[in-house]
């Protein structure tokens, strides 16, 4: 396939090949196995495919309907790449393909150890070289896609959207044929202590009932090779493998991790502090990543010494927590996990470790990309009064304002009273002043750029945007920081901030935002178009009482244009 083809042209031209192979190959004779959403591609034995790509390498994560005794193969560019098993039973495999040409379309094919096709072939295209000058790239971005569809909140309330709703939202986003997908954290919701030890009896009962059906992890045993592995697949398959299936097989993905991906909510109480994650939670998070979705591929400007990078039990040189999406000289996206390496060192604390902060600051000041986007898993610009935020604000009511001063713990369903609002008049239990100090160093570097300062965040169950004009004593008015919440795919009724905490996401006390408009608590996603002269971000939202059928023709409710000059 010639390099001059765009990714969209390549996918269109490759479609006929995939359809023909599915119909003609004896491997699928009489098959009633799953096809993709449009019914024109035969998934065969494959349950899910999630590929990462840069300009020279592909890393593919895959799962199959049943365990494979012999290692499967990935056929690409005349090569046979032997799969590396990610689990005990041979259902999960990964394929690492280095040495590819930049900006080139490839046809991929999975086969078993004897060479028999396991699914139809499909196309995938590498990114342009870092020194290339592409004129356009399109991203599909969202957060909080996880959640077991059978889980329930207090009183049987819907906790997460059905897979049908999430599938419809994904299909609508993919209809725009993005060049890459960024899923910003919270791919899994299966909290342990924070559900089972909640101060709310209804949450404890809902969690207990659910875990009685699935089983509880034995924290004294390894994750793999014990019954923990069965429980893990039971809990996670619906949230990742069944959610994505093979929809993204031809679209490079970037999956960031956040708090729930370590099987806890970010909470601090007198009887427990959930982050940084303990050893077992960390093992759960790393195992899910290893089995289900790709790590970040290496980038020449990102040190292999960053925490969570170049581990001996991972593909060479990948990073588990800090990633780069580089699309020629047009775009650089810096993605960072704000959970795994959080520290509790008072004024010296950080939500990300010092090495990662240095990387962010260096790239912000030195990147030659036309556009630079920061993408943390914990948002700048708004607060829900949660513990692990950059800001010290807590949710209080008129009644708590009259209570004696002291530290307040902010838990799900934990704030009662009238006229709820954010306040810094009372301390937030275990909140670290070093977190905001780190925030200030990042916003200072971002506003100091000659290009627009842009940040797109995850975690917060809402959609919206604003511009930061001031942060504490940092004046950003000469180059305001664009803040965008890209939308939440899976949040159900129990998860909206106004339901869980009594207050919609609001502006922290220490910030001055230009619009000061509360984000919208609806499901959705963003389509982001980047050209040399501007970034255009289209925000899509949906929620009842709008009919389900409206998702298939959803149009943006807001369009943000960020010009380069």
Language-model features: locations:
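Metal-dependent phosphoester/phosphodiester hydrolase catalytic core
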Residues: 35-565
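N-terminal export signals
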Residues: 2-3, 9-31, 103
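Short, cationic motifs built from Arg/Lys/His that form the positively charged side of catalytic pockets
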Residues: 7-8, 439
């Amino acid at each position: 396939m010639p390099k001059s083809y765009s990714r969209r042209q390549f996918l269109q031209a490759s479609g006929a090949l995939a359809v023909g192979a599915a119909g003609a190959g004896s491997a699928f004779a009489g098959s009633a196995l799953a096809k993709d959403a449009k019914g024109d591609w035969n998934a065969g034995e494959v349950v899910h495919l999630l590929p990462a790509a840069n300009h020279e390498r592909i890393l593919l994560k895959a799962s199959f309907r049943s365990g494979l005794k012999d290692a499967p193969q990935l056929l690409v560019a005349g090569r046979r790449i032997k799969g590396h098993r990610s689990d005990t039973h041979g259902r999960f495999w990964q394929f690492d393909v280095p040495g590819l040409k930049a900006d080139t379309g490839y046809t991929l094919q999975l086969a078993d150890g004897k060479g028999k096709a396991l699914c139809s072939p499909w196309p995938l295209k590498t990114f342009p070289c870092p020194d290339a000058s592409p004129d356009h790239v399109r991203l599909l971005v969202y957060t909080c896609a996880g959640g077991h569809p059978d889980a329930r909140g207090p009183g049987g309330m819907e906790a997460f959207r059905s897979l049908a709703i999430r599938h419809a939202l994904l299909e609508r986003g993919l209809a725009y044929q993005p060049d890459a997908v960024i899923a910003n954290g919270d791919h899994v919701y299966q909290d342990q202590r924070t559900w089972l030890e909640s101060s709310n009896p209804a949450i404890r009962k809902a969690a207990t009932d659910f875990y009685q059906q699935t089983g509880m992890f034995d924290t004294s045993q390894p994750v793999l090779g014990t019954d923990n592995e069965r429980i893990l697949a039971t809990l996670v398959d619906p949230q990742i493998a069944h959610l994505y299936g093979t929809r993204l097989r031809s679209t490079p993905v970037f999956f960031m991790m956040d708090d729930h991906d370590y099987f806890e909510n970010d909470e601090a109480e007198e009887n427990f502090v959930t982050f940084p994650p303990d050893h077992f939670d960390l093992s759960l998070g790393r195992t899910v990543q290893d089995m289900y979705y790709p790590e970040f591929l290496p980038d020449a400007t990102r040190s292999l010494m960053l925490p969570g990078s170049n581990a001996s039990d991972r593909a060479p040189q990948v990073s588990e927590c800090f990633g780069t999406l580089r699309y020629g000289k047009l775009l650089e996206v810096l993605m960072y996990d704000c959970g795994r390496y959080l520290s509790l060192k008072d004024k010296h604390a950080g939500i990300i470790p010092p090495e990662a902060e240095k990387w962010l600051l260096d790239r912000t000041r030195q990147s030659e990309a036309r556009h630079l986007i920061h993408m943390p898993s914990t948002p700048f610009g708004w607060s829900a009064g949660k513990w692990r935020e950059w800001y010290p604000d807590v949710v209080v009511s008129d009644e708590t304002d009259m209570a004696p001063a002291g530290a307040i713990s902010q838990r799900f369903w934990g704030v009662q009273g009238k006229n709820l609002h954010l306040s810094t008049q009372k301390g937030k239990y275990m909140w670290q002043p070093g977190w905001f100090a780190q925030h200030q160093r990042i916003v200072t570097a971002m506003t100091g750029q000659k290009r627009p300062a842009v940040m797109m965040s995850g975690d917060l169950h809402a959609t919206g945007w604003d511009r930061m004009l001031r942060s504490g004593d940092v004046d950003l008015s000469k180059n305001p920081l664009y803040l965008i919440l890209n939308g939440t795919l899976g949040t159900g009724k129990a998860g909206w901030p106004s339901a869980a905490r009594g207050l919609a996401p609001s502006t922290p006390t220490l910030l001055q935002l230009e619009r000061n408009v509360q984000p919208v608590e609806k499901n959705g996603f963003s389509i982001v178009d980047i050209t040399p002269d501007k970034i255009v971000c289209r925000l899509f939202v949906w929620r009842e009482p709008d009919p389900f059928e409206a998702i298939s023709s959803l149009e943006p409710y807001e369009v943000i244009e960020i010009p380069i000059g």
